[in-house]
């Protein structure tokens, strides 16, 4: 029976608990939260099996720990969990990854603890916060980014990967700095812009009669996330400020280019710009929905920390989708094999070439889904 610790029983923590208890076979969930009312409600809703009075109590015997704390508190909470020892893999759910890794690396924790931390970020959520809004199916089909490092223990990474898969998520490895740049582009910048748009409209539509009824659906769609959870987004903006500022600079340059076309009355350039946006949007959506046949590869590797992370990150950076994975240690525990199932036409061949470039031999296995 797998014991899972959830530190922070809110929307995400509660949804993890519900999904794990109902989908991960044999899982029990121990919850801890600084707010006793959240624990009580989590127990009533079936999100946790046990209310714990401390992080130490929640981690007792746990195999996986989910840190579901505000971004500014993730590193401190993760450190407290890692200090409990054992072979528990500790992960988080925040949308900023590099700052957490850097803070943990500078915390004085030994490598034996740091190698048990794998940053995580599910691309799922809701506008309403709190465990009352938690849902078992929140992560169904959702990408769940994982940021393993050269320290990561392969067996612990696989344990986390399989648990997330059983909860309906699609785990995907990504480097922490790449993750933060990506989130700055597709999540954090849109939140900044939504707030700017609302502020601009509020200053322009000064009369109450010119309020929201004067706006169209485009404005409502573009500003849906404006004003969302100010303390949460304050922490996200500050923690990922370098990446967000870079994106704002690029955005300002793009706006300047549009302004120049408008000043010049260059309708043809504006039309091409809009057409390019439509093409790019379609390409991005097609990439998100891409699937294809699934093939299995076996990769013999030595039993050393970081190898699973190295391979998973290399394939992810090449755009190869790992749909499942398994580790098979040799009896002497000095070596073993990684089984990888990759999706898409030609992905198996590309994956084998990439793995070979890392110094490992990858062999296709007949009888896959594709």
Locations of regions flagged by a protein language model:
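Interdomain hinge/lid region at the active-site interface
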Residues: 207-277
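Rossmann-like NAD(P)(H) cofactor-binding subdomain of soluble oxidoreductases
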Residues: 77-132
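Internal alpha-helical scaffold of NAD(P)-dependent oxidoreductase catalytic cores
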Residues: 138-227
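Residues in the short beta-alpha loop(s) of Rossmann-like NAD(P)-binding domains
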Residues: 33-35, 94, 328
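N-terminal Rossmann-like NAD(P) cofactor-binding module of classical short-chain dehydrogenase/reductase
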Residues: 65-66, 91
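A conserved regulatory-domain signal marking ACT and ACT-like small-molecule sensing domains
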Residues: 280-370
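NAD(P)+-binding Rossmann beta1-loop-alpha1 motif at the extreme N-terminus of oxidoreductases
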Residues: 1-54, 60-61
